């Protein structure tokens, strides 16, 4: 049986760990709330961009744009996968789930090329058979619009240059505080029919009756809106992934705190047993010594 000193040392170590997990839980809770507020505050702007794109599609049908599905290219030769992971661990299966989803997607694509966001994703795929084109890292802070612009500009420039023929985005979607699942989204090339189906949710009946004039042309206005649209999609995915990460870390820290408290309770019982055994032994020795002196 362990002595009292060993039990006390273990209890002290677990108490220190418990303080850390509770502090990380509080920090993740605060970051989660802030991320949700930011997502709610920026959503109206990018929703407005989507509405404007619907207006153009409704008016022009299928404007000529290099962002739509290209013809005469002989199919898809290279596919880019933008994967959103984190820069820190201690978030349960958050990063592992994303990396597995990306691996599964890459296995179905022809010549996949990786654009990674987060250092953990880079460490996971650096020795994989897939080529890493670029790695972005934001040091575990709340993503900003400029971060999304940096990624969107890179993706769009490489797409227009012909480095790849299509772009997939993989991130963690937060269905609820306890349900986080990897999600895939095809962001390039655009498909007019798919966009119409998605964008008709925006008060389509009222807007269909409105007439807009686009200067200098619908094609030029549309091409100017697409980078903003893609930036909005990427930014929303970054913030949602950030919020999901904080939720996963909060859940992991709650579980760790619960386990630490259970271990402390068990150690306290063990400590009491060891202490009681020591007291019993001392009393027995005193009684035995007293009896020997009486004889």
Per-range role (PLM):
Residues 1-295:
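C-terminal beta-strand-loop-alpha-helix "lid" module of Rossmann-like NAD(P)-dependent dehydrogenases
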């Amino acid at each position: 049986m362990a002595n009292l000193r060993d039990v006390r040392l273990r209890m002290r170590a677990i108490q220190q760990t418990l303080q850390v997990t509770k502090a990380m839980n509080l920090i993740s809770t605060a970051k989660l709330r802030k991320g949700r507020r930011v997502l709610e505050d920026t959503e109206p702007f990018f929703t407005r961009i989507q509405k404007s794109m619907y207006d153009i599609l409704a008016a022009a049908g299928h404007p000529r744009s290099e962002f739509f599905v290209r013809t005469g290219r002989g199919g898809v030769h290279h596919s880019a996968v933008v994967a959103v992971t984190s820069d820190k661990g201690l978030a349960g299966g958050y990063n592992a789930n994303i990396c597995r989803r990306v691996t599964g997607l890459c296995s179905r694509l022809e010549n996949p090329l990786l654009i990674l966001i987060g250092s953990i994703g880079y460490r996971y795929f650096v020795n994989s058979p897939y080529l890493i084109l670029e790695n972005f890292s934001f040091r575990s802070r709340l993503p900003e619009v400029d971060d999304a612009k940096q990624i969107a500009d890179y993706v769009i420039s490489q797409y227009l240059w012909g480095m790849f023929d299509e772009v997939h985005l993989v991130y963690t979607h937060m269905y609820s505080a306890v349900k986080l699942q990897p999600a895939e989204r095809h962001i390039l090339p655009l498909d007019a029919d798919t966009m119409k189906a998605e964008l008709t949710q925006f008060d389509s009946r009222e807007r269909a009756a409105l007439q807009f004039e686009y200067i200098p042309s619908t094609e030029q206005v549309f091409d100017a809106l697409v980078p903003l649209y893609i930036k909005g999609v990427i930014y929303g995915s970054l913030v949602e992934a950030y919020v999901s990460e904080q939720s996963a870390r909060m859940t992991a820290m709650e579980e760790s705190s619960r386990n630490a408290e259970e271990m402390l309770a068990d150690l306290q019982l063990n400590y009491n047993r060891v202490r009681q055994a020591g007291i019993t032994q001392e009393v027995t020795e005193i009684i035995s010594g007293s009896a020997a002196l009486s004889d």
